[in-house]
Amino acid sequence: MKTLARILVVFTLIVGLIGFFNPLPAQAALNAVDAKLTTEFGQKIDLNNSHIREFRDLRGFYPNLASKIIKNAPYDKVEDVLNIPGLSERQQERLQANLDKFTVTEPSKELIEGDDRINPGVY
């Protein structure tokens, strides 16, 4: 009986040590937002997914024109932003001059859920 107990203890130690010295490699996980950053979303302002603070670098956009853009999303193509109702001629000129800084991707629930694109809570 003692021999059986010793064999069982030794076997348990061997199995345990094999698992200890042979760790599993970490699995790389890529979430939806990381995947979107590999597209134009990471380099340009996405009209369907960006929040209002990303328009601060564009002269004349923050906060009024940027909020109009966000409230009228989603867009199918970048040029659709020129068709926002109620834009002044000056706002249309600013949009036209900066069309190359925008992109349009599919709306992602991870980025627009909670309707916080106007106030994302970043202070």
Swiss-Prot record:
One of the extrinsic, lumenal subunits of photosystem II (PSII). PSII is a light-driven water plastoquinone oxidoreductase, using light energy to abstract electrons from H(2)O, generating a proton gradient subsequently used for ATP formation. The extrinsic proteins stabilize the structure of photosystem II oxygen-evolving complex (OEC), the ion environment of oxygen evolution and protect the OEC against heat-induced inactivation. It comes from Gloeothece citriformis (strain PCC 7424). HAMAP family: PSII_PsbU. PSII is composed of 1 copy each of membrane proteins PsbA, PsbB, PsbC, PsbD, PsbE, PsbF, PsbH, PsbI, PsbJ, PsbK, PsbL, PsbM, PsbT, PsbX, PsbY, PsbZ, Psb30/Ycf12, peripheral proteins PsbO, CyanoQ (PsbQ), PsbU, PsbV and a large number of cofactors. It forms dimeric complexes. GO terms for biological process: photosynthesis; photosystem II stabilization. InterPro entries: PSII_PsbU (IPR010527). Keywords: Electron transport, Membrane, Photosynthesis, Photosystem II, Signal, Thylakoid, Transport. Residues 1-28 form the signal peptide. This is Photosystem II extrinsic protein U. Pfam families: PsbU. Belongs to the PsbU family. GO terms for cellular component: extrinsic component of membrane; photosystem II oxygen evolving complex; plasma membrane-derived thylakoid membrane. It is a peripheral membrane protein. It is found in: Cellular thylakoid membrane.
